[in-house]
Design a protein with these regions (language model features):
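Receiver (REC) domain switch/active-site residues of two-component response regulators
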Residues: 152
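Acidic/aromatic-lined carbohydrate-recognition and catalytic surfaces
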Residues: 1-140, 144, 148, 159-170
């Protein structure tokens, strides 16, 4: 067939609120797709046949079940609070009038706080804060981990959403 590359949609651990585009663990696999040992075997067999592996990668947001986000919700003073975008409300309302891709506000209120978190897509997909160098470093570490495993590269999903207008104007 002349196949030179396999493009694999998200197969990372996910609660599947958005077909796997809500990743809860970048270093683990969704059970339906097998184990990390299966991934290693796939990479090895593909290499024998001169076939590369291209994986979908979502780095605009994670699942709200990701450990970073859970820690951010649990402890407002956690370093992970700054891994995401949290803003104080304005006069009892969301920080801006921005709308999400899936409809409704991009802001979701956090429990009993007067704080909201940002999600460009579904409320179960909180956006990462790309203004935070520590968060970027952890994402780069994960990317390199996969490259060291032997995949050929990534198709980066929703990359045009990672930069936000920091003025936060309506």
């Amino acid at each position: 067939l002349g196949v030179t590359m396999l493009w694999i949609c998200p197969m990372y651990k996910s609660p599947l609120a958005d077909n796997g585009y809500d990743i809860s663990d970048y270093y683990d696999m969704l059970e339906d797709y097998g184990t990390m040992e299966d991934v290693d075997a796939l990479i090895a067999e593909a290499k024998k046949r001169n076939i590369g592996i291209l994986m979908d990668l979502v780095i605009n947001h994670t699942s709200d079940e990701h450990a970073w986000f859970q820690e951010a919700l649990k402890d407002p003073n956690s370093k992970y609070r700054n891994y995401y975008i949290f803003k104080k409300g304005v006069d009892g309302h969301a920080p801006t009038n921005w709308r999400s891709v899936f409809g409704g506000s991009v802001w979701e209120k956090v429990g009993n706080e007067e704080t909201y978190y940002f999600h460009a897509f579904a409320k179960k997909q909180p956006d990462l804060n790309w203004e935070n160098p520590e968060m970027r470093k952890d994402i780069y570490k994960m990317i390199n981990w996969w490259l060291d495993k032997g995949i050929s590269g990534f198709r980066v999903d929703a990359i045009n959403f990672i930069k936000k207008d920091q003025r936060w104007c309506d």
